[in-house]
C-alpha cells in the first residue's frame, strides 16, 4: 500500500523521526547506528519536547529495535496525540506478535515497516508480517541494500505475498545496486532520489540516495550521532538525554 505511506527519509519540520532506542537484538551491519548500546529516549523529555513542537504531520519510531522498550505502547500512544497523519514503526519484526500489534494499533499506530535482508530471514518472519498486515493494513517490507539482499528473489517473494516494498539505500552506498526482478519497470521519480517501480503488476519503491535534504530535517535520536537532534533539543530547551554508556563522550556527539 503506497497511498499514505510515510517515506521516512523525507523529513521536514512538519514530520519527525523518533529513534526511541539504540538498543538492538540483531547485528545488522547496514544499520546506521554508530553505537549499539542500550540508550533509551526519556519518556518525560519526549513529552516535554512534543508539547513545545506541537502537532506533527507524521512521526516514525525507529532506530535500534524499538520493541525492546517495555513502554513502546505508551510511547506510541503519546506520539499519536501529536500527529495529524499517523505514526509509523520501523522494526526488524523479531519481537512482533499478535498481542503487541493489536496493542500498538489501539495506541494509534497506523503504519509498520518490517526490515528484512535475506530470503531466509523473510521466510522466518513471513507469518507474523502477514498477521501484522491483517491488523494494520498499511504494513510494508523494507529491504536494505546489503550483501544478502542483492538477489532479486527476496523482493519477488515479498511482492507476491501482497506487500508494498521499499528498497532502502544503504546510508553510505556501500553495497552497490540491488538486482531488481527481470521485467521491473520504472514508473516514477519524485526528484529526490525516490523511484517508483512496477513488476508483474506489483508496485514497489527504491531509494536512490540521501543527498538532497538539508539541515532543517528533523530526526529525533537519543544519541545524536545521525543528525542535529541535540541542536534541536537545545533550541527548544530540552537537552536531557538518557545515556547509559559512559564510553560515549561529547566529542562523538553532533553539536
Outline where the language-model segments fall.
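Canonical Radical SAM [4Fe-4S] cluster-binding loop centered on the CxxxCxxC motif
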Residues: 1-44, 229
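Generic structural signal for well-ordered alpha-helices
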Residues: 8, 46-50, 73-76, 101, ...
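Short, well-ordered alpha-helical microsegments
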Residues: 69-72, 96-99, 150-152
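Catalytic cores of alpha/beta
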Residues: 100, 147-162
Amino acid at each position: 500500500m503506497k497511498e499514505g505511506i510515510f517515506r521516512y527519509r523525507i523529513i521536514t519540520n512538519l514530520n519527525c523521526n523518533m529513534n526511541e532506542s539504540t538498543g538492538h537484538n540483531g547485528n545488522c551491519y547496514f544499520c546506521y547506528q554508530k553505537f549499539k548500546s542500550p540508550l533509551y529516549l526519556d519518556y518525560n523529555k519526549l513529552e516535554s519536547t512534543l508539547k513545545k513542537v506541537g502537532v506533527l504531520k507524521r512521526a516514525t519510531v525507529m532506530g535500534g529495535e524499538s520493541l525492546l522498550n517495555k513502554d513502546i505502547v505508551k510511547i506510541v500512544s503519546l506520539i499519536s496525540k501529536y500527529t495529524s497523519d499517523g505514526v509509523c514503526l520501523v522494526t526488524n519484526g523479531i519481537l512482533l506478535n499478535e498481542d503487541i500489534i493489536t496493542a500498538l494499533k489501539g495506541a494509534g499506530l497506523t503504519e509498520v515497516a518490517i526490515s528484512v535482508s535475506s530470503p531466509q530471514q523473510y521466510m522466518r518472519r513471513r507469518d507474523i508480517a502477514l498477521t501484522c498486515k491483517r491488523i494494520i493494513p498499511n504494513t510494508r517490507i523494507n529491504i536494505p541494500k546489503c550483501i544478502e539482499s542483492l538477489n532479486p528473489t527476496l523482493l519477488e517473494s515479498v511482492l507476491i505475498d501482497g506487500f508494498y516494498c521499499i528498497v532502502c539505500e544503504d546510508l553510505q552506498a556501500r553495497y552497490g545496486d540491488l538486482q531488481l526482478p527481470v521485467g521491473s519497470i520504472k514508473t516514477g521519480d519524485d526528484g529526490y532520489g525516490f523511484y517508483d517501480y512496477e513488476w508483474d503488476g506489483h508496485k514497489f519503491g527504491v531509494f536512490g540516495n540521501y543527498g538532497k535534504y538539508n539541515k532543517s530535517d528533523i530526526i529525533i535520536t537519543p544519541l545524536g550521532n545521525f543528525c542535529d537532534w541535540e541542536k534541536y533539543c537545545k533550541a527548544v530547551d530540552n537537552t536531557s538525554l538518557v545515556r547509559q554508556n559512559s564510553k560515549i563522550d561529547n566529542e562523538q556527539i553532533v553539536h
